[in-house]
From Swiss-Prot:
One or more lysine residues are methylated. InterPro entries: Ribosomal_uL11, Ribosomal_uL11_bac-typ, Ribosomal_uL11_C, Ribosomal_uL11_C_sf, Ribosomal_uL11_N, Ribosomal_uL11_N_sf. GO terms for molecular function: large ribosomal subunit rRNA binding; structural constituent of ribosome. Forms part of the ribosomal stalk which helps the ribosome interact with GTP-bound translation factors. The lineage of its organism: Bacteria, Pseudomonadati, Chlorobiota, Chlorobiia, Chlorobiales. Belongs to the universal ribosomal protein uL11 family. It comes from Chlorobium phaeobacteroides (strain BS1). Pfam families: Ribosomal_L11, Ribosomal_L11_N. This is Large ribosomal subunit protein uL11.
């Protein structure tokens, strides 16, 4: 018989840097998950992407076991990295803080494609352009 799902936990954790401190510890502790076991598995799986924020969905079962799925980094994080910025604009409609090319947008869209709700690469690129616009980043080309 299949295990009964007790809940889902969605977190955004820096790759290779999960530790029992907040926000990871309290979120997993509420569901009774072995926090250190999750941290070890997550850090091992995301070691190669260190420094990037990785969204993770943890499925908790009734016997306190868990599985987790890592997603692609948020589009905003990828855009900031491509544009070479620290963060997006506080006033995106007035202050433009950086520029990305159409090729960079395509690269991000191809990376994000599995997690985006888009049928083709053009639809995914349109979503990435919208994210860039809302961050005060100009798309050239």
């Amino acid at each position: 018989m299949a295990k009964k799902v007790v809940g889902f936990i969605k977190l955004q954790i820096p790759a290779g840097a999960a530790n029992p401190a907040p926000p990871v510890g309290p979120a997993l502790g509420q569901k009774g998950v072995n926090i250190m076991e999750f941290c070890k598995q997550f850090n091992a799986k995301t070691q190669s992407q260190s420094g990037t924020i990785i969204p993770v969905v943890i499925t908790v079962y009734s016997d306190k076991s868990f599985t987790f799925i890592t997603k692609t980094p948020p589009a905003a994080v990828l855009l900031v990295k491509e544009a070479g910025l620290q963060k997006g604009s506080g006033e995106p409609n007035k202050n433009k803080v950086g520029k990305v090319t159409e090729e960079q947008v395509r690269k991000i869209a191809e990376l994000k494609m599995p997690d985006l709700n888009a049928f083709d690469i053009d639809g995914a690129m349109q979503m990435i352009r919208g994210t860039a616009r809302s961050m005060g980043i100009v798309v050239e080309g």
